[in-house]
Amino acid sequence: MRITIRKDKRYPYKVGMDDKKLLIPQQKQFGGFCQKHGCSVTACSIALQFAGVKQEDGTVWNQREIYQYAKKHIPGYNGSKLTIWGCKSVINKIAGREVAFWHSNNGRHDTSIRANIDTSLREGNIILFEEKNPIHTVVLLGIDSKGRYIVATNGRVVRRSRAGEIRKALHGMTGAKNQKNWWSGRDHGAGYVVIKG
């Protein structure tokens, strides 16, 4: 993995992963909604790039465009952020195929969840991950040589302890029927999403 800092306020980092180049957006550069609730649509932008999904003109989907698309095509808009389930919904809708796969997290299976996430990252996938306190969506890009997660968050790429990151996970209800696309409480918006490229 190659991480490059760029002189670009909108996309301050670029990450090279094998044949993929991911621009890491800074959510504060894409309008009022994105400044307040943009972490989830930022994660969607990275996920769509990873899956090779671009717009007709060849440009990446930015946060403002994803937000406008989601309001139009993803049910239940209430003025709040997309949940992790909503991220899965909008990514697959834009992609026109299933590239995003949601997994629940009720807080009772941290060891197996960490093992599943680690396996998925080592298989070359990325993970959209919902944190608590504050509620925040990040993207797990990989595992470094010291065993830490490589995390895209707030327009930066940082490294974090795997155990520490799993402890930050938002916990909620299991089952697809209990999930909401737009934020309406932690019970209906927890878990993580595996993105396959």
Residue map of PLM features:
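Short, solvent-exposed mixed-charge patches
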Residues: 1, 196-197
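Active-site-adjacent structural segments surrounding the nucleophilic cysteine of cysteine proteases
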Residues: 1-78, 163-168
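Conserved active-site-adjacent core of cysteine acyl-enzyme catalytic domains
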Residues: 60-196
